[in-house]
From Swiss-Prot:
ATP binds at residues 192-199, 264-273. Its main location: cytoplasm. Probable member of the two-component regulatory system involved in the regulation of the hydrogenase activity. HoxA is probably phosphorylated by a sensory component (which could be HoxX) and then acts in conjunction with sigma-54 as a transcriptional activator. GO terms for molecular function: ATP binding; ATP hydrolysis activity; cis-regulatory region sequence-specific DNA binding; DNA-binding transcription activator activity. Pfam families: HTH_8, Response_reg, Sigma54_activat. This is Hydrogenase transcriptional regulatory protein HoxA. The keyword Transcription regulation applies. It comes from Bradyrhizobium diazoefficiens (strain JCM 10833 / BCRC 13528 / IAM 13628 / NBRC 14792 / USDA 110). It comes from the Bacteria. GO terms for biological process: phosphorelay signal transduction system; positive regulation of DNA-templated transcription.
Length: 485
């Protein structure tokens, strides 16, 4: 095992510390503290390459702490990890504290490890360029070589042939569509439920295309308010809005010559959709606060778990933008629609778990694979990955038996939807639809014991979208977790 760097985790919850340590310890030395005071004491005597800090702590916010770290110990790369998405906190974090990455809960282990690896790499590149006496933005031959090698690895990692599926799987047709899309410089819209692998397909399309040697950039459009989303994508000038303390290059410029993946595009507002449409039509962006436009050459791959055609008919999504994005539509099947792939995917996940948990003898009992086949997997492949990791953590033996929690979920049937008088009465269509939507959400909350992540996944909503609906229907008291704390 090769340790790539030292990571400082600052989180007041011991369970969160342990979860991060477990995921990162394979590649990094992980130091955990529960508050800012202990973190500062540690920074005085340790060389730390990157800091992962929770936003909400008892006596001080993560942003406030990292702002001070930036002044006193500017070298470590700073990252915020949180389940909260207040716009002012995010804006302040990205600008005042010089945050490299804002990571939202629930985070995915593989993505988190890659993000931290990139942060450590950035630390080393900064130190190298300081030693050479040049600005970190200057592209040296060494940096070009690092980037070239990294993209070569990515091309192998995200090849279409590495997408797990059997010959009888509906994924076979999806992959063929993806290969065709890769051959042409055309916008692609990937639809499907949360956790089906939309980003994986988007990466395969990029790395199978003529743009493979340029950047592939990801933005989750459902996680940020309009102003910050525009700043992220189009860039901004210093002073363009509250918290814009420096010029910022947008992701469209970062992706120039490459591909940008716009996840959860269906969560965007009509006002933002107008601005995105212009970018697609004119191939140019205007950073917030700037007077001049800038030309960009970027391929757009968008994804959504919503029925965008229905959203268009309802007036919530612009028709002209939909047709721009859906020049080449591809639908990802749910995991329950490809049961023949479940054993293959499960074995692939288990192989990764063996390595990351250093338990090479782990194996599935036959009963576990049978249980996997019975379950409907509302969270799709992502839920299957999480379930296998959980099984490995809880297992005292090398054989992973049928998980009892999964068995209880299998036996848990949906209660009948409550009968509302307005559904059968003379109420307006809007009122009837709202009543039905509230009933569905209540039913799902009950079935999942109020777990926000599972409910959002099952309903095909982002956590932000679900929180809004819980507030609208006064269902916040039915939810558990950190959604409203």
């Amino acid at each position: 095992m090769s340790i790539q760097g030292t990571i400082l985790v600052v989180d007041d919850e011991v369970r969160s510390q342990e979860a991060l340590r477990r995921v990162l310890r394979e590649d990094f030395e992980v130091l955990c503290v529960g508050n800012a005071t202990d973190a500062e004491k540690l920074l005085e005597g340790e060389i730390v390459h990157a800091i992962l800090c929770d936003q909400r702590m008892p006596h001080e916010s993560g942003v406030s702490f990292l702002k001070r770290v930036r002044e006193l110990w500017p070298d470590p790369v700073r990252m915020i990890i949180s389940g909260y998405s207040e716009s002012e906190d995010i804006i302040a974090g990205l600008n005042e504290a010089g945050i490299y990455q804002y990571i939202t809960k629930p985070w995915q282990p593989d993505q988190l490890v890659e993000t931290v690896k990139e942060a450590v790499q950035l630390y080393r590149l900064q130190k190298e360029t300081e030693t050479a006496g040049v600005d970190v933005k200057a592209t040296s031959g060494h940096i070009k070589k690092v980037v070239s090698v990294k993209r070569g690895v990515a091309k192998q990692l995200y090849d279409f042939d590495r997408i797990v599926h059997s010959t009888e799987s509906p994924m076979h047709a999806v992959i063929e569509l993806g290969r065709r899309a890769a051959d042409y410089d055309i916008s692609v819209l990937i639809t499907g439920e949360s956790g089906t692998g939309k980003e994986l397909l988007a990466r395969a399309i990029h790395y199978g295309s003529a743009r493979a040697n340029r950047a592939f950039v990801v933005e989750n459009c459902g996680a940020l308010p309009d102003e910050l989303l525009e700043s992220e994508l189009f860039g901004c000038k210093k002073g363009a809005f509250t918290g814009a303390y420096q010029d910022r290059i947008g992701l469209f410029e970062v992706a120039d010559g490459g591909t940008i993946f716009l996840d959860e595009i269906g969560e965007t507002s009509p006002a933002f959709q107008v601005k995105l449409l212009r970018v697609l039509q004119e191939s140019e962006i205007r950073p917030l606060g700037a007077q001049r436009v800038r030309k960009v050459d970027v391929r757009v791959v968008a994804a959504t778990n919503r029925d965008l055609e229905a959203e268009v008919e309802a007036g919530r999504f612009r028709r002209d933008l939909y047709y721009r994005l859906a020049a080449f539509p591809v639908h990802m099947p749910a995991l329950r629609e490809r049961p023949m792939d479940i054993p293959l995917i499960a074995e692939g996940v288990l192989s990764a778990v063996k390595s990351s948990f250093n338990r090479p003898n782990l194996r599935f009992a036959r009963s576990a694979l049978e249980e996997f086949g019975k379950y409907h997997w509302p969270g799709n492949v992502r839920e299957l990955q999480n379930e296998i990791q959980r099984m490995a953590v809880l297992a005292d033996r090398d054989e992973l038996a049928a998980p009892p929690l999964l068995g209880r979920r299998n036996g848990k049937r949906s209660a009948p939807l409550p009968a509302h008088g307005r559904l059968n009465g003379s109420a307006s269509l809007k009122d009837k639809v709202e009543d039905l939507e509230k009933s569905v959400i209540m039913n799902c909350l009950e079935r999942n014991d109020g777990n926000i992540s599972r409910v959002a996944s099952e309903l095909g909503l982002s956590r932000v979208g679900l929180r809004n609906k819980l507030s609208r229907y006064d269902l916040r008291k039915n939810a558990k977790g950190d959604a409203f704390s």
